[in-house]
Amino acid sequence: MKAVLPDSKIPKRWYNILPDLPEPLAPPLDPETDEPIEPEKLLRIFAEELVKQEMSTERYIEIPKKVRELYAKIGRPTPLFRATNLEKALGTPARIYFKYEGATVTGSHKINTALAQAYYAKEQGIERLVTETGAGQWGTALSLAGALLGLKIRVYMARASYQQKPYRKTIMRLYGAEIYPSPSDRTEIGRKFLSEDPNHPGGLGIAISEAIEDVLKDEKARYALGSVLNHVLMHQTVIGLEAQEQMKEFEEPDVIIGCVGGGSNFAGLAYPFVRDVLSGKADYEFIAVEPKAAPSMTRGVYKYDFGDSGGYTPKMKMHTLGHTYYVPPIHAGGLRYHGLAPTLSILINHGIVKPVAYHQTEVFQAAELFAKTEGIIPAPESAHAIKGVIDRALKAKEEGREEVILFNLSGHGLLDLKGYEDYLDGKLEDYEPDYFPALG
């Protein structure tokens, strides 16, 4: 069972949650003064239109015609499936649906914001975009966006994933991007971390620092971010807006589930539904799933912190483990982040979104069952959502009640097979750190 929309149903507007949040978003702070940052300082890092979108209180932002055309080219609208075989395997009365972002040409949701960010950069006359990537999904997406729109792309990839997922590098290079392991010897902050540990596995926080340092050396370059900030999450709402249309062919969901690193794929599916809860039109539940190795939602502190490891970004008020936190080298590279989207942090604080955390071994067990029943090998990041779905479906079975579960399968795992090999060979290591810098 699946629902497929025609190209004409690609959303014409992104949904901006800012005007609907239960409390105002705390302003980002200038790291030099600890005062709210002036937008002019952000313009040296980000494309101008993205800074405007970040600050906008308009509920809807029109999607440019060119971006909608590119969305159609890369596989939007993506299909929505019912996981009937998984339901049978679990023996649950719950009905499970998933939005499959792995159907895009780059294999994940990341292309939704990559195309938007590249479009606005090109319109401004920017020549080069620089970014970070964890597992490589975001770097791959921005590399293709650059190729389609005529921009040079440079990617700093967390070293652990650079080594674990070699074919991501090949794809990025094929799309024309430069790619470097992070920490690298190309930046001052990279050299600092390498001097402390020549085999440092890196992480999203360090890669962000390197990308920003790189950008500040070139007037024609700007930084592109794969998650966390509001404009990134807003671009992803095409997922949830499509899913709302597709679920009309089936039934209303009771609970919506997604994995979380910075928060963009979760927000992409959930925020259009959150809007209906905040306006009193619906009563959905929302579950956000993270790794126990990077538990910003379940064990972090809500405070101002840097978005990167080097302290180059503005300070944001968010759930954080501390920007100097060493994130263990789990295979879900896209979830190896110390912080969290500020908008999602607020929703968690108000009890609208409920977080849970799992070890990577149990996550891969869930992924194996999903692969055997539904045929799709999920990305390790997306497999966290699947683990959450399975637990929720088994709870419905235990309580003898029907329930409709909708989750975001944010990407496929066909280039993450080293993690699956380690799992099948019994080599996976579970991490549950007991020290986080933000907690002191």
Curated annotation (Swiss-Prot):
UniProt modified residues of type N6-(pyridoxal phosphate)lysine: K110
Cofactor: pyridoxal 5'-phosphate
Keyword Membrane: no
Pathway: Amino-acid biosynthesis; L-tryptophan biosynthesis; L-tryptophan from chorismate: step 5/5
CDD domains per UniProt: Trp-synth_B
Keyword terms, alphabetized: Amino-acid biosynthesis, Aromatic amino acid biosynthesis, Lyase, Pyridoxal phosphate, Tryptophan biosynthesis
HAMAP family reported in the protein's UniProt record: Trp_synth_beta
Family membership noted in the UniProt record: Belongs to the TrpB family.
Subunit structure: Tetramer of two alpha and two beta chains.
Protein name: Tryptophan synthase beta chain
Source lineage: Archaea, Methanobacteriati, Methanobacteriota, Thermococci, Thermococcales
